Amino acid sequence: MATRTVTVGSASGLHARPAALFVAAAGAAPVPVTIRTGQKRAVPANSMLSVLSLGAKQGTEVVLEADGEGAEAALDGLAELLARDLDAEEPADA
């Protein structure tokens, strides 16, 4: 199983727009991905409600896990996304 630990970089944490971008990217991954904070139970990374329920604020460490072909690359991309301040970036459709 592939695992990545990453610190949430967005100023608002995993809330609203950053969470939506992350959930969309996780849903496009070639393997199922889970996300958790601390010792909490892992939740599906492609579920907006589950991701929001984590209450991950800026600076929170989250753990991403996936298994299967393409898991390493998928987690690399998702970890890079979470580490950025998505609040400071312009929306792609702007």
Language model regions located:
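Intrinsic-disorder/low-complexity, polar/charged segments enriched in Ser/Thr/Lys/Arg/Asp/Glu/Gln
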Residues: M1-T5, E61
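C-terminal structural segments of small proteins and small subunits
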Residues: K57-A94
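Broad hydrophobic/π-residue packing in well-ordered secondary structure
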Residues: A2, H15, A29, E80-L86
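Compact, glycine-rich, soluble single-domain proteins
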Residues: T7-Q58, E72
